[in-house]
């Protein structure tokens, strides 16, 4: 298995790039966001997921960071989501936007590209469970640096519920100290 590949972008196509590594060109499927940030000749590092399709053809999927790769891996475990669909979701939504959509139960964020309301609901339900099980440091940067969220999680509150309450408090009182946010969150969560 391949964990990551570093090389020069040789070609950019509609859904993949050809990455030249040691004079070998690897076809790597990437999100539209990656396609837009790459230029021919760029030296980039991609984290790789390997998939062998029904015809026994190996396909490589590349991500600029582990966070995007982690969300991709979670998405493909959901019934009805294949690699192509997961990549189209990541083309449309960043991991932070996926997290926010899950927290806010926003089915509309996932709809489109063959995803209807029922599948969008399944995505939200299954990701709520999977995100709550992820270690806090793997969720994403705004969670990593949030002491108030870390405090609530250490007290046993669910990550998504605590995050939602903290975001609500911070939107109403953006200058609140960490202690104030924790106090208000505990009041709200104990109701």
Swiss-Prot record:
Q: Which InterPro entries match?
A: DNA_helicase_Holl-junc_RuvA_I, NA-bd_OB-fold, RuvA, RuvA_2-like, RuvA_C, RuvA_C_sf
Region Flexible linker: which residues?
143-146
- What are its GO cellular component terms? cytoplasm; Holliday junction helicase complex; Holliday junction resolvase complex
Q: Which Pfam families match?
A: HHH_5, RuvA_C, RuvA_N
Q: Where is this region: Domain III?
A: 146-191
Q: Which Gene3D superfamilies match?
A: 5' to 3' exonuclease, C-terminal subdomain, DNA helicase RuvA subunit, C-terminal domain, Nucleic acid-binding proteins
Compartments annotated for it: namely: Cytoplasm
Main localization, broad class: cytoplasm
Q: Which UniProt keywords apply?
A: Cytoplasm, DNA damage, DNA recombination, DNA repair, DNA-binding
Give the superkingdom in one word: Bacteria
Q: Does the keyword DNA damage apply?
A: yes
Gene Ontology annotations of biological process type: DNA recombination; DNA repair
Q: Region Domain II: start and end of each range? A: 65-142
Domain I as annotated region, ranges: 1-64
A GO MF term: four-way junction helicase activity
User: Tell me, how does this one assemble?
Assistant: Homotetramer. Forms an RuvA(8)-RuvB(12)-Holliday junction (HJ) complex. HJ DNA is sandwiched between 2 RuvA tetramers; dsDNA enters through RuvA and exits via RuvB. An RuvB hexamer assembles on each DNA strand where it exits the tetramer. Each RuvB hexamer is contacted by two RuvA subunits (via domain III) on 2 adjacent RuvB subunits; this complex drives branch migration. In the full resolvosome a probable DNA-RuvA(4)-RuvB(12)-RuvC(2) complex forms which resolves the HJ.
Quote the function comment for this protein.
Answer: The RuvA-RuvB-RuvC complex processes Holliday junction (HJ) DNA during genetic recombination and DNA repair, while the RuvA-RuvB complex plays an important role in the rescue of blocked DNA replication forks via replication fork reversal (RFR). RuvA specifically binds to HJ cruciform DNA, conferring on it an open structure. The RuvB hexamer acts as an ATP-dependent pump, pulling dsDNA into and through the RuvAB complex. HJ branch migration allows RuvC to scan DNA until it finds its consensus sequence, where it cleaves and resolves the cruciform DNA.
Q: Which family does it belong to?
A: Belongs to the RuvA family.
Q: What is this protein called?
A: Holliday junction branch migration complex subunit RuvA
| Annotated organism of origin | Ehrlichia ruminantium (strain Gardel)
The primary gene name is: ruvA
